[in-house]
Amino acid sequence: MLIKILEEKLMELIQIVGVIFALFALSRVVLQLKRRSISFNEGLFWIFVWGFVVIFLVFPEFFGYVAEVLGVGRGVDALIYISIVVLFYLIYRLYAKINNLERQITHIVREIAIRDRYEPKKRD
């Protein structure tokens, strides 16, 4: 009996801490949007993600419904599957950004090499 009460209180504590953390993360995203440190689309994505976290923490039974719609056994399974898809998307985005940066660096290095080839070297 006491263990059951403690488990319920612990779950509530975990939910409270999680919501506080998610709201803190949301405030950081909004601050970065105001400073224009991130693009509008990136900000919108992270607002969606952290909002989704808040919904999950406040209404954990919501994922039971999502699991039924997706045809998955449990809500936690649906959460894991959705998380994996989101992580693969983020990995793809990082790959695309790194690939773009590599192309830009290659272009800059080639421009510098061509410029240095035809300009006389200055001696100190």
Swiss-Prot record:
The listed locations are:
Cell membrane
Membrane-protein topology: Multi-pass membrane protein
Q: Does the keyword Iron apply?
A: no
* Chief localization: membrane
Disulphide bonds in the chain: none
Give the UniProt entry's GO cellular component terms: plasma membrane
Q: Pfam families from the xrefs?
A: DUF2304
Q: Where are the transmembrane segments?
A: 13-33, 43-63, 71-91
Q: Which controlled-vocabulary keywords does the entry list?
A: Cell membrane, Membrane, Transmembrane, Transmembrane helix
Query: Which protein family is named in the record?
Result: To M.thermoautotrophicum MTH137.
The protein, known as? Uncharacterized protein MJ1580
